[in-house]
Design a protein with these regions (language model features):
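Non-heme di-metal
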Residues: 1-335
Length: 335
């Protein structure tokens, strides 16, 4: 029986422009059904592999315009995705030291050194409107589907950890109010800043560093064996986002942005401060009591999230320091 389910074309992005032979093979396979080319030792952090992997993961979200929904489970595409995942995961494990002490790792996330400096520090003090728009463009690839990658872990949890995690996700999805869904608030902010808020609209302009952060979430969410790493990634965001969100609110106010622009990050200043305790005590505590062998994976998730975030932060600061765009191809606008 042929599947009849469809996704509205209004919610489905166009296939991106390839960035090398690997992503070209994936795009061609999605467009006309040809078998995908095998993995050819592409740079695991590079533009080509990260875009190819992102496209394969996107089949599990909203897909692409003109691509049949059942391609999500195409055996050839799944086999290629597994090759690319292994290359990416191996690179991460090679670059990230092993750790076992989850509580020490989380305590470290709560301390921001006086000399800490990142993109949100720059935007608060010196950032210009075009840089703020670029930052939002980078973040849109995740925040327009905020909480979706993490939702895959729900059936892989049990007991108190599951109940508490669902409570946090309930908040992310607006607590029953669609107008308060975090993905919706982000789209409202994008429009207020004059940035295209269509889902997937910026896939062609964000670099591999941006794609890798989202790919980490998708990879960990889709693999039960990586559920500990997914929760480590999730904890990292929840424990570290409040100060950065506050800096972004201040940056927007300094640049004259109104409440429609600031609402998303203002919401995260308060919500993530509450979520911090829920993640530590309500999710990770019960999880590690029941499955202490997952501690190493949780630490890996924390460190992988920090590692990839650091790569993107370095790119942003380097390009902005030179007065250059951090996007691959974007006409800069605004003061």
């Amino acid at each position: 029986m042929r599947p009849t389910g469809t996704v509205s074309s209004a919610e489905t992005p166009e296939l991106p422009v390839p960035r090398g032979p690997l992503s070209a093979g994936v795009v061609e396979a999605l467009r006309d059904g040809t078998p995908p080319a095998p993995h050819d030792d592409a740079d695991p952090y590079g533009q080509d592999l990260q875009l190819a992997l992102y496209c394969l993961y996107e089949l599990h979200y909203r897909g692409f315009r003109g691509v049949e929904p059942e391609r999500e489970w195409d055996p050839g595409l799944l086999a290629l995705r597994r090759e690319l995942e292994l290359a990416f995961l191996t690179a991460l494990r090679d670059d990230i030291p092993v750790g076992h002490d989850v509580e020490a790792e989380l305590r470290g996330l709560l301390v921001e050194t006086p000399d800490a400096w990142g993109a949100t520090h720059h935007l608060r003090r010196d950032g210009r409107l075009w840089q703020l728009r670029e930052y939002v463009t980078h973040r849109s690839l995740y925040h327009l589907k905020e909480a979706d990658p993490q939702a895959w872990v729900i059936p892989r949890l049990s007991g108190a950890a599951k109940a508490c995690f669902v409570t946090i996700e309930h908040d992310e999805y607006g607590a029953g109010r669609p107008e308060r869904m975090h993905s919706h608030l982000f789209a409202v902010m994008m429009r207020a800043l004059g940035v295209d808020d269509r889902y997937g609209a910026h896939l062609d302009v964000v670099p591999a560093e941006t794609l890798a952060e989202v790919n980490l979430m998708s990879m960990c969410g889709l693999h039960r064996s990586l559920r500990g790493a997914l929760l480590g990634q999730f904890a990292t965001v929840e424990l570290t986002s409040s100060p950065g969100s506050d800096r972004l609110v201040r940056a927007m106010r300094r640049l004259g942005c109104g409440p429609e622009a600031t609402d998303f990050y203002a919401e995260h200043v308060e919500a993530d401060a509450v979520h911090e305790q829920l993640v530590r005590r309500g999710v990770l505590g019960p999880l590690l009591t029941a499955e202490p062998e997952l501690a190493t994976d949780v630490v890996f998730g924390v460190r992988a999230a920090i590692h990839l975030a650091g790569r993107l932060e370095a790119l942003l600061l380097e390009r902005w320091a030179r007065g250059e765009s951090s996007l691959l191809a974007q006409a800069r606008s605004g003061a």
